[in-house]
């Protein structure tokens, strides 16, 4: 009798992707984040679906409907906080996943890497629009400030902003369309994630050594399924600790005040996971320059494969590049801290230096370090 797992049209796709998939025998816990991102996405879609059943996307009732979910809906509070903190876990996993790709040279799979960048942009857009929905002070002013950045685009900027707003300010039309987009985009993300996996399975996974592992493969199940389950349990543990003990730790207190167009909060800032990009945006005095730097801070990932000058794939045996990589991580943490601070001395200078260093490491220092390491190999 033939195994249904290997013959059924649907089952054989699942089988070749998650069961009999040949995987390198030495991939570390850094390779867990792909599956964790999948779990985060499923969690966000499910909790979001239940929230959407009770949420109303109208400026007069949006804030009240979120309060109603927390107070009157059965387990509404936990669904709401799972969704809010689930987004934070999503971004932690995303940044770890991208960091792993940079460290181990996974970006040499250019198709997979480029789809990943598109995924990152899509998830960021989804999260931004989701932050607007509770219609608190930071929701309203965050939406106003970030959408207003598009007015820096020459000639069409102002018209573009008013088109996105659906009027002359962030109002009912804006909230309704943001809700519609926030609902549909996670499904777009799911489709892109499938394409991401499709491209990955064309080449097979990278591994910590960066050496081709075709001669040493093991089946995905049971070895990596059990490893992924362990990762998932740890993710759920951290998420539940956040949700049940300090659900508002990563949020902004200003968002518990209903949106008021007549009162600007003293410090407008996005959620913590956008602070590094926000700091780069603010570090350039010119509006258009700031917007370009903001976009380039993520888009720079697309040219990383072109700047790969090393003879080795990963950084496992490249000490100079390792130092630069961890300097980049420290720099991003500094930018995240600066993004949450008011625009005053010394934060302005620190932010500008950190922004310059960010682009310097990726564009100049890492390619030079790779060339030096190549020459050291000849000794």
UniProtKB/Swiss-Prot annotation:
The chain crosses the membrane at residues 33-53, 77-98, 113-133, 178-198, 226-246, 288-308, 320-340, 347-367. Its cofactor is heme b. A ubiquinone binds at residue 201. Keywords: Electron transport, Heme, Iron, Membrane, Metal-binding, Mitochondrion, Mitochondrion inner membrane, Respiratory chain, Transmembrane, Transmembrane helix, Transport, Ubiquinone. The keyword Transmembrane applies. Binds 2 heme b groups non-covalently. It is found in: Mitochondrion inner membrane. Heme b b562 binds at residues 83, 182. It is a multi-pass membrane protein. InterPro entries: Cyt_b/b6_C, Cyt_b/b6_C_sf, Cyt_b/b6_N, Cytb/b6-like_sf, Cytochrome_b, Cytochrome_b_C_euk/bac, Cytochrome_b_N_euk/bac, Di-haem_cyt_TM. SUPFAM superfamilies: a domain/subunit of cytochrome bc1 complex (Ubiquinol-cytochrome c reductase), Transmembrane di-heme cytochromes. Heme b b566 binds at residues 97, 196. GO terms for cellular component: mitochondrial inner membrane; respiratory chain complex III. Pfam families: Cytochrom_B_C (PF00032), Cytochrome_B (PF00033). GO terms for biological process: mitochondrial electron transport, ubiquinol to cytochrome c. Gene3D superfamilies: Cytochrome Bc1 Complex, Chain C. GO terms for molecular function: metal ion binding; ubiquinol-cytochrome-c reductase activity. Component of the ubiquinol-cytochrome c reductase complex (complex III or cytochrome b-c1 complex) that is part of the mitochondrial respiratory chain. The b-c1 complex mediates electron transfer from ubiquinol to cytochrome c. Contributes to the generation of a proton gradient across the mitochondrial membrane that is then used for ATP synthesis. Belongs to the cytochrome b family. Heme 1 (or BL or b562) is low-potential and absorbs at about 562 nm, and heme 2 (or BH or b566) is high-potential and absorbs at about 566 nm. The cytochrome bc1 complex contains 11 subunits: 3 respiratory subunits (MT-CYB, CYC1 and UQCRFS1), 2 core proteins (UQCRC1 and UQCRC2) and 6 low-molecular weight proteins (UQCRH/QCR6, UQCRB/QCR7, UQCRQ/QCR8, UQCR10/QCR9, UQCR11/QCR10 and a cleavage product of UQCRFS1). This cytochrome bc1 complex then forms a dimer. This is Cytochrome b. It comes from Phoca fasciata (Ribbon seal). The lineage of its organism: Eukaryota, Metazoa, Chordata, Craniata, Vertebrata. The gene is MT-CYB.
